[in-house]
Structures are given as structure tokens and as C-alpha cells.
Swiss-Prot record:
It is a peripheral membrane protein. It comes from Bordetella avium (strain 197N). InterPro entries: ATP_synth_F1_ATPase_gsu, ATP_synth_F1_gsu, ATP_synth_F1_gsu_CS. Produces ATP from ADP in the presence of a proton gradient across the membrane. The gamma chain is believed to be important in regulating ATPase activity and the flow of protons through the CF(0) complex. SUPFAM superfamilies: ATP synthase (F1-ATPase), gamma subunit (SSF52943). The gene is atpG. The keyword NADP does not apply. This is ATP synthase gamma chain. F-type ATPases have 2 components, CF(1) - the catalytic core - and CF(0) - the membrane proton channel. CF(1) has five subunits: alpha(3), beta(3), gamma(1), delta(1), epsilon(1). CF(0) has three main subunits: a, b and c. One of its GO terms (biological process) is proton motive force-driven plasma membrane ATP synthesis. Belongs to the ATPase gamma chain family. PANTHER family: ATP SYNTHASE GAMMA CHAIN, ATP SYNTHASE SUBUNIT GAMMA, MITOCHONDRIAL. NCBIfam families: ATPsyn_F1gamma (TIGR01146), PRK05621.1-1 (NF004144). The keyword Cell inner membrane applies.
Amino acid sequence: MPGIKEIRTKIKSVQNTRKITKAMEMVAASKMRKAQERMRAGRPYANKVREIAAHLMQANPEYNHPYLQQREIKAVGVVLVTTDKGLCGGLNTNISRLTLNRFKDFEAQNIQVRATAFGNKGLGLLTRIGTKLVSQETQLGDKPDLDRLLGAIKVQLDDYLEGRIDALYVATTRFVNTMKQEPVFLRLLPLASGLNDPFQSGLEHLESTTEVKSDYGWDYIYEPDAKSVIDDLLQRYVEGLLYQAVAENMASEQSARMVAMKAASDNAKKVIGELQLVYNKTRQAAITKEISEIVGGAAAV
């Protein structure tokens, strides 16, 4: 049985650890609320762009944008969104496992993969497995910087337009609620005809073709022309989806970290209680032994 001093040292150590995890839990809770606000704030913009783009495409059915064209899949681009830091439960493990399974499917079909990494954890994974990396962004902080995101993703969009890839996927963690985060592997390009929002529907692929019904019966007047307007709207729509993927992952990260730190704090409290019980028993045994020795010594005298 360990001595009293050793047990007291262990209790002090666990108490210090609990203070750290409790502080991290509170910080994560604060960041989680802000991340959720940013995530939800981006949805109205994406919804309106999607709605307008769908209306314009219905009004101009003769124009088939490259983002809508179906091709034979020979190569794909994958944007892997992970965190820069750990201590967030199984968040990165789950999305990494899903991504590796999809990579195996691509390999079985002899489909090449060109990847973009957002976050240190994803970058490390792609580097270890030898995936061709075309762009990367790490140390994104607590608030996604749109300029940095678009700089990294432009490589993939250019590859798609120039035919180097035939589809573009994003692997991220969809925020469901504070206690649940769902790893998803979503197809961004080619776009489905209905331009559905994957982060609201929770679908693994953008296969749904639900059409947006227009309430407007008049013709549009375009400046400079219909093609330019649709091109710009679809570009912004895809960029909005990618921003949303990163925002969803950040909200999921803070939620998972808060839950993980709360579990760590609770476990530390339990360990402290168990150590305190052992300490009390050890101290009681030592006192009893000392009393017995004193009584025995007095009797001998």
C-alpha cells in the first residue's frame, strides 16, 4: 500500500489536472457558442444564393454550367476538414476512418485522388498514407478566414474546370447538436440539379434532385448577361458550401472538446474521491499502529 505522502501527492496532482480540464471545458463552451452562431449565420446567405441560382437556371435551361455536367469518374478531388489540435474526443478519428474507407473504394475502382487538407490532423493523415496533396491550410484559428480557405480550394476548383478531376468531395464533421457530431463525406461537384444543402439535410451525397419552384413569372434582365450571372452565383454557392463545411467542423470541434473535458473533469473528481478514501484508510491505519505501539510500550514499562 502506498504511503500517506505519496497518496497526498497523487491527490494534489489530480486536483491540478482537474483545474486544467475544467478551465478548458469552460473555454470550449464559450467558443462553441460563438462557433455555432457563425455556422448558423452563414446558412441564410447560402440558402438565398442557392435559391436565386436555381431560379436563374430554370429560366435559362439551355445553359449547362460545367459545375452541373456529369462525367465519367476517373479522378476525384477530396477536401479533408479536421482540427489543428487534439483533446476533442473521437472527432478526428471518426472522420479519418470514414475518409480512409472512401479512399479504399476509390482505389478499388482505379480512381485517382487529389486532396486538400484543412487542419493539422488531416494533413498528417494524408501525408502518412501518401495521398497526392495539391493544397493545404492549417492553423485556421477559431474563426474561418474566407480568403485563406478560398486560396486553398481554388486549386481544386481549377482542376475540376480543367478536367483534371471529375468530381469534388468534402469530408467534414456535421454539427447535429452539442452531444452529437456526425462525420460525412459529401459530393460537392458536380452539383445536383436542386442545389440542396447537405448540412441541413444530413445526406451523405448530394444526390437529391428536389427542384426549387419559382414564384416569379416574369423574365429576368441580366447585367452583363445570364451566363456571367449564373457563373458567379454558382461559384459563390460552391465557396459557401466549403465555408460551411469548415464552420460545421469548428462548431463540432468545440462541442466535442467541451464534452471530452467535462468527462475528464468528472473522472478526475471520481479519482480524487477514491484516492481520498485510500488516504483516510492509510492514515487511520498509521494512527492505529502508533497508538498500539504506545500502549504496548506503556504496558512493558
